[in-house]
Amino acid sequence: GGLSTAEGLPTSNLPLRGGKGWLYEGGIREPYIIKWPGAAEPGTVCREPVTSTDFYPTMLEIAGLPGRPEQHLDGKSLVPLLRQEGGVDRNTLFWHYPHYSNQGGFPGAAVRKGDFKLLERFEDGKVQLYNLAEDIGERNDLAETMPEKVTELRKLLHDWYLEVDAEFLYPKEEGGAVMPWRPGE
């Protein structure tokens, strides 16, 4: 008995790169399935990017409940999308993983604006830039050929760090001192 993986890995996110614990699309792009009789037609597919923080404000709106003033909502209600009345009033998404994990990902953050996504590694500040419309598998790093786009997205990401008071880590250093890294250092 047992599991044989002679033909390859037991699971795959292809054509997406990475998996759980990674900032690549294979780790953050997931189907979001909602059933709401009378609002969304069965089989409807929406390609607008959303995030898990959108779930809470969506449920509040569906239930007809106001958000509490002391609560800060990072997400946006998806009700206009579900009712096919419009989109979500947002064109930028952020992800922040300031830690090591057992899945092999790296501590870092990402920002997506339109079709472009920038990843920033916290260990060394290295960035990667991808055009997801043309490269869903994130194989062609455009950071060196599009420095103006890197600057634009990196500024958005660093401004967001300050806005949300993002936490950072002390990266592991092989055989040396542990040195902190923060944006702009």
Tell what function each PLM region has.
Residues L132, P147-V150:
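C-terminal structured subdomain/cap of oxidoreductase catalytic cores
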Residues D141, T151, Y161-L162, K172-E185:
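Extracellular/periplasmic ectodomains of large secreted or surface enzymes and adhesion receptors
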Residues L3-E25, A40-T44, E48, T53-L132, ...:
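C-terminal cap/loop subdomain of S1 sulfatases and analogous C-terminal strand-loop tails that border
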Residues Y32-I34:
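Short glycine- and hydrophobic/aromatic-rich loop-to-beta-strand nucleating segment
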Residues D135:
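Intrinsically disordered, low-complexity polar regions and short flexible loop motifs
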Residues D89-R90, R154-E173:
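Bilobed periplasmic-binding protein-like "clamshell/Venus-flytrap" ligand-binding domains
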Residues R29:
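Conserved nucleotide-sugar donor-binding catalytic segment
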